[in-house]
Amino acid sequence: MTTTLTRPADGEGSVQVQQDASVRIQEGALVIAVYGKGGIGKSTTSSNLSAAFSKLGKRVLQIGCDPKHDSTFTLTHRMVPTVIDILEEVDFHSEELRPDDFMFEGFNGVKCVESGGPPAGTGCGGYVTGQTVKLLKEHHLLEDTDVVIFDVLGDVVCGGFAAPLQHANYCLIVTANDFDSIFAMNRIVAAINAKAKNYKVRLGGVIANRSADLDQIEKFNKETGLKTMAHFKNVDAIRRSRLKKCTIFEMDSSEEGVLECQNEYLALAQKMIDKVEPLEAEPLKDREIFDLLGFD
């Protein structure tokens, strides 16, 4: 006897964490999920982009979705407690919490939340992200927000860490001009396309980071239908801003590369505000990427 198991559809061949209506962000706010290969600079990019939106007069909330909870420290100038840690302190009775227990104000008024995550090898990071959004809604903290940025762990595209895609309008992918970063980006494109079948999320574009050139990125973009939205070269001031625990907007603009980076972040934020045209990109097969990238 053969038993056929049917799985809830959420893109072809995928089983994903489903978010109920109570944890979805209301229409009106611009919601961006930032993905990319681990260590590529997503937190740096997210924090500086949040700062740029705030400079343009927007009310911004950044949600770090990594158990390392290091997404927002350049905005807050410290490591803030995570939502999961705070909930554990009150035995998960969220009604006992006040907003300032888990949400912290950073540079130029940016609101910062670190969702945290379960111990390594246990639990589901997507569930934690969903509970974070639910908590924010319970305390009416999303009602006066113009922009929400999810800074997502590594290039994990399982059901759990794909959860932010269920809230987002756009996904931005951070990459470098190298094989490994672009290979990871290709997998992320596939995950976003799967989510886009049932959710509003669409590809917003590529952020080239720590890259002097764009030749390999542009090769990939041409084949898949992606587009580079911003380009940040390997500017030492960005590295030093992390060590100083501050955003690029708090660095001396007379230093080499600082003003250029600030302007590029402001330009990227303005592009997103002006309603980016969603991209219809198609991922390549692994062998196709292998054959595509490299020098002739």
Curated annotation (Swiss-Prot):
Keywords: 4Fe-4S, ATP-binding, Chlorophyll biosynthesis, Iron, Iron-sulfur, Magnesium, Metal-binding, Nucleotide-binding, Oxidoreductase, Photosynthesis. Its cofactor is [4Fe-4S] cluster. ATP binds at G39, I40, G41, K42, S43, T44, K68, N209, R210. Homodimer. Protochlorophyllide reductase is composed of three subunits; ChlL, ChlN and ChlB. It catalyses: chlorophyllide a + oxidized 2[4Fe-4S]-[ferredoxin] + 2 ADP + 2 phosphate = protochlorophyllide a + reduced 2[4Fe-4S]-[ferredoxin] + 2 ATP + 2 H2O. Binds 1 [4Fe-4S] cluster per dimer. Belongs to the NifH/BchL/ChlL family. Pfam families: Fer4_NifH. This is Light-independent protochlorophyllide reductase iron-sulfur ATP-binding protein. Component of the dark-operative protochlorophyllide reductase (DPOR) that uses Mg-ATP and reduced ferredoxin to reduce ring D of protochlorophyllide (Pchlide) to form chlorophyllide a (Chlide). This reaction is light-independent. The L component serves as a unique electron donor to the NB-component of the complex, and binds Mg-ATP.
